[in-house]
Amino acid sequence: MDTDRTGLAAMPLHAITAELGEPGLRERLAIETATFPDPDRLRLARALELAARLHAADRRQREPYVNHLLRVAIRIICYYHITDPDVICAALLHDAVEDHAAELAASGSQPDALAVLAAQFGDRVADLVGDLTNPRYEPGRDSREQYREHVEASLDASPWARVVKASDFTDNGLGLIHATGPAFSRLAAKYAPLVPVLAGLIARPDTPLRDDVKAHILDQFGRAQDRFTAILTAHHAGYPPHDAGQPPHDAGQAR
């Protein structure tokens, strides 16, 4: 990689992704964790390699899925000012059980997969991942409604899981910049109902983030809601989603 470490540390996450891809994001995570105690850095490295192995065949739009996991973790360190290794491990592994329970545990059950994570990374990491894992939905009920209900209930009692979810939600919203066709309206319909739920959770006094960080996240959520509304309005009116306003302000740029 030609970019020096000083330059890489100052680059927005979207620029690292576009110009340097996974190697650049891995290096940025290494920079951000360079001062962590050795045991914490080693545990984070193990979490990243497990996540990379589990999601090796997964893609997000035009990129490897691991890029998403890296950005979620880096954003928590750089922009949320969180250095708790359990929280960062959970960020790297937050989709592992939901998407790959069968690779973690022979039974394929989510509780057994979480037990494997607990044995490897500790109970707190497994608990956070569990709070961030969507259950298998009931047939016959609207999946988006069940998703919203699960997020609201699971994060209500898990302040640190809210931190990971805020970064995950911010990064997921970036998919709307690159999505085309029906994907625009599907994603907007999925995420729009979550904005007020997550905003309320982030604003709570027990959410362990600085006030200025909360304010920034809430501003991003508000702009994301405007974007989702524009996409859905255009969809119902029959306009191309590309004309539905602009991407959320600085989501995935500096932060």
Predicted region positions:
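Active-site helical microenvironments for divalent-metal-assisted chemistry
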Residues: 2-245, 250-255
